[in-house]
Amino acid sequence: MTPQQPEIQLIANLVVRRPDGRVLLVRYHSDDERWWLPGEDLEPYEHPDDRARATLDRIGGVAPSSFGLAFVESFRGRRGWHVVFHYRVEADGKPDGDHAGEWFEPDDLPRTVHGRWEREAVRRVLE
């Protein structure tokens, strides 16, 4: 029997940092108290840069001064294999887009959906 090919999920993930060093987290679901790093799944054949910029546009009210790929990681997740493109964005402003957003000190992040993984992603992007 041939093993089945795993589902592969491609994700653009952003660590958005203000000049004062705070990072942006968003709430994708109003009934969930946990926070997320901004990010979205890529559409088929979409370039990660394009999805990252679209995610930033949906945040709204945040003006980037720099934008670039920081690192790529892959791991087995609950829904198959994940390939995550982590972007570092220097920006300022008040998020006013599709989802609630707030700025937090990187060393004092609130409860996040993925816990230690998000904290480690922030650390790696900002180092």
Name each region found by the language model.
Residues 57, 61-93:
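Active-site segment of metal-dependent pyrophosphate-handling enzymes
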Residues 33, 88, 95-127:
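NUDIX/MutT-family hydrolases
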Residues 40, 54, 67, 104-107:
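Structural detector for helix-capping/boundary residues
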Residues 7-9, 18, 79-82, 96-98, ...:
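A generic fold-level signal
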Residues 1-23, 41, 72, 88:
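Conserved N-terminal beta-strand and adjoining loop/helix that marks the start
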Residues 22-59:
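Conserved Nudix-box catalytic region and its N-terminal flanking loop in Nudix hydrolases
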Residues 20, 29-30, 73, 93:
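Short, flexible active-site-adjacent loop segments at beta-strand->alpha-helix junctions, enriched
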Residues 42-43, 74-76, 109:
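Short histidine/acidic/glycine/proline-rich micro-motifs that form metal-
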